[in-house]
Amino acid sequence: MLEALLRQHDKVEQDWAEKDVPKLVDQLLDNYARFGGMDHLEGRDLPSKKVVTEVLEDLFSILFPGYLGDSEITKANIKYHLGLKLTSVYSRLTIEVEKSLKYICRKMECPQDICQKRAHVVVKELLEALPEIRSGLSGDISAAYSGDPAAVSNEEVILSYPCVLAITTYRIAHELYTRGVPVIPRIMTEHMHSLTGIDIHPGAKIGRNFFIDHGTGVVIGETAEIGDNVKLYQGVTLGALSFPKDEKGNIIKGRKRHPTIGNNVVIYSGATLLGGETIIGDNVIIGGNVWVTSSVPAGTRITIAAPEQHYKMENNIEKK
């Protein structure tokens, strides 16, 4: 009985492979032809998301040796570890950056070696910026530790706080973004968005000592500017008020669409700040669930009135 079932299964599998698979292949090819923009069958290779995320993990291990990464780091082997990781990141990331640059140049008659040379320069500059990036991250971690009464130590912050991963990724991706590298910065930040729930566009400009408490649902748009010593809580949106369109109805890109936040600002959970002309002055406190679409002077505290609540008791008597 068992042998008969196995033979029947093998026959069904063979029939499917010989008859149905070719039909399915033809259907998919027809679908590719009718619905463009979802395949990349012609032209140069696109950067590999897998390689980019692996490189990002290696950069974490360089910035936080002994904390993030799968290697056991000691003072005895740290020099070897850094040399190995830097060399590996340089070679792999250069290939991916070159692909991303060629992706932009595919419709232009660029000399073949320009993208390759530019990729080497960009990755070299990123790696040389790591000491400065790390100095900035030190302030971000200190801001998290001092700004959260539940934080026990810097070690706990580095190992467990999602904002550390999100902000670190942003600061790496921002270096590539400002050097004109397409695709890869978004791969990095969207990868971390999927892991942490914190969405920071690599084009945003963020100052020192930045802290996102809890983090889930935070959105920071491409043209947002954030000063020093700023603290955001979960669910804060720094977004666009509207999207101006051209005469054909297409969204006009490249304009400032997101708010500017001054120094020493605290924005509590659920607050929404919209618009490129919205400027929040220094030392402002914005309460939870506040909706802001215009500029706020320095030193202002904004809150919304508490909603009226009604309680119905067991004796059906309503109490306000």
Q: Which residues does each predicted region cover?
A:
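Terminal amphipathic alpha-helical/low-complexity segments used for targeting or macromolecular assembly
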Residues: 1-187, 318-320
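Structural signal for interior beta-strand "rungs" in well-ordered beta-sheet cores
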Residues: 193-314
